[in-house]
């Protein structure tokens, strides 16, 4: 998205409760999406001549229904590596999230999976996926057990980087 959130990794977007900031006129309850329309409809905020602006003060401090922790870092990654490379990486992350949700979600892990795919690096997610695919015992597990197994793998990777896979609510 414009601001560094990744729509394809957002539970609201996945549930079709949000059109994303590209949803067109009238869908911009977000001040950053409105701002983009007022500044020539830039694809990413870093492309705006006024970036960074006051809208980015404390933007990573708290989460909503999606983690906000990497917004600035993700915008910098897109700026540094190029939008095409950044978007290609996000597409791969969306595919991995889809695998987790389609095959291993017991109905209680969607938020955890979305947060993990947002915060972990693509290579780390690919390593988790490789481990899952090469575990011949996984087919004998119930969906609930599979879901717990995947959650544990993701939490273990996150723990090595001191990443908490929970949303941070404003107090």
Protein language model annotation of sequence segments:
Residues 1-171:
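Cysteine-centered metal-binding/redox modules
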């Amino acid at each position: 998205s414009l601001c560094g959130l990744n729509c394809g990794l957002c539970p609201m977007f996945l549930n079709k409760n949000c059109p994303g900031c590209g949803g067109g006129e009238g869908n911009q309850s977000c001040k950053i999406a409105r701002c983009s329309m007022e500044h020539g409809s830039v694809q990413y905020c870093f492309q705006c001549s006024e970036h960074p602006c006051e809208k980015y003060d404390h933007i990573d401090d708290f989460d909503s229904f999606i983690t906000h922790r990497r917004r600035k870092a993700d915008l910098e990654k897109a700026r540094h590596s190029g939008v095409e490379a950044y978007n290609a990486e996000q597409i791969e992350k969306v595919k991995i999230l889809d695998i987790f949700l389609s095959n291993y979600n017991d109905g209680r892990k969607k938020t955890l999976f979305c947060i993990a795919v947002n915060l972990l690096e693509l290579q780390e997610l690919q390593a988790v996926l490789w481990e899952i695919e090469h575990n011949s015992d996984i087919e004998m597990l119930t969906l609930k057990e599979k879901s717990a197994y995947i959650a544990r793998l993701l939490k273990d990777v996150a723990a090595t980087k001191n990443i908490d896979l929970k949303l941070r609510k404003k107090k």
